[in-house]
Amino acid sequence: TMKHVGLNVAADPFMNSSLVGINGGLVLIVADDPSMHSSQGEQDSRFFADFAMIPCFEPTTQQEAYEMMFEAFEVSEKNHVPVMIRIVTRLAHSRAVVHPFEHDRFVKENTLSKADRMEWMLLPALARKNYEKMLQKQDILTEWSNNARWNPLTINEKRRDLAIVTSGLGRNYYLENLQDYKDLCEKQFQEQGLPSTLHIGTMPYPIDSLKKLAKTAKTILVIEEGMPFLEKMLKGILPQENIIIGKLSGHLPRTGELNPDFVRKALSLEVNPSVLSSSSISDTAANLPSRPPQLCKGCPHADSYSSLNKAVSLLKESAGSDNVAVMADIGCYALGAVPPYNAVETIVCMGASIGMARGAAQAGIKYSFGVIGDSTFIHSGITNLIDAVSTKTPMTVVILDNSIVAMTGCQQTILPSSQLETLVAGLGVEKEHIKVLTTNPSKIDENTRILVEEAEYRGVSVIILVRECLEAFRIRNKAAKAAKV
């Protein structure tokens, strides 16, 4: 499981996994984030599934997500391909009662036979053959999609002006407006009724159903969550005489999440006066006192940024503002970019801080800092630090070690904090320029002094600022108390 930007990091093995002979089911659940609630982009993972030429499921409800998981494994095992299940923020953050399958649906664990070694060697000569096999599977996968129950088609021969295609949560928002839309259609089109509809829950797309739908109407409205991926695809699949409308045509917004109000407008429905529209809610919220995100009270990062800001101020006094750069990374500590700290200048992606600090130093900035969390450093910072060491770049890496993966649920880091110093030394940083410091209010001035000293060093220095996350402390305490009971 991962979110969309996590798939970016996994792109190399992901793309190549479609070319090897998957021996047993392999299913990836990827969560996209329309409206960027906790991400730096709205990218749509369906592009990746299409790029890799693998099947993709897009559930509409929690029940569908549950049931699709079973079929995803079946499709993967039968066709020896990885399968993606693409969800979005709104579905990932929701709950509902799910009716499980009967126990006999579960297959007992079987021992897999060893895979053919030739299926797992992507040397050019073998990779070409595997690529041909993948292309041959496309017709089989398309036929499966044509018959999949996740793609219900409803044809109304009487209504010829419009047809509707939905996918994912777009179907929910259409159904939410269905009764009002039905009333409107009866009023405007009398006995012609509702337009023909096709809901798409799988990729490759069900070509047969799409072509049947295209014959019923000239104009097709596409309601999808995320980028206009399906809308673009239909323009290449369907005849040119079909007019495809949706996000690209301006009938639905290109940015942010879909909601029932946006779909309502696309269906030419008036906003229900008895229900607050999304825009009205936004206007109301704009007049409320703001509560911007901030570090938790007692967060160790607060003291770390206090030390860093003091050090940066001293360095700017001696070298000028343009000779100091502070690059940060993705994590709780990204909140160091906002008041009251305003401590960092860049936040791009996981691991970028060290690489950007190295670039700044090589571009001539005298004092360059890369601020990164302990878990992010292990995830994406190690190779950048190796690069900096190999080029003897004058820069300072500040690792904020709170002993936990705090931002995404307080998971344990894959390497204990006690081993960070050993790891950094093993990457080639000189031991006298690796400083492990406790960060708390009483240590701010001392830590400031050490930050300034290490910034003056004309090579790579690493400062590890250590204090346990308060939430991690609470979890550990709670577990300890429970163990005693």
PLM-predicted stretches and their roles:
Residues 1-77, 317-406:
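Thiamine diphosphate
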Residues 21-31, 108-118, 390-401, 420-433:
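A glycine-rich helix N-cap at a beta->alpha junction
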Residues 32-35, 52-57, 247-252, 292, ...:
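Short beta-alpha connecting loops at secondary-structure transitions
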Residues 59-295, 300-301, 449-458, 462-485:
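Flexible, low-complexity linker and terminal segments
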Residues 64, 199-207, 228, 332-333, ...:
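Short acidic loop-to-helix transition motifs that present clustered carboxylates
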Residues 80-82, 159-162, 218, 321-323, ...:
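Active-site lining segments that contact anionic ligands and/or coordinate catalytic metals
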Residues 103-112, 345-348, 352, 412-425, ...:
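Acidic, Ser/Thr-rich peripheral helices and adjacent loops at domain boundaries
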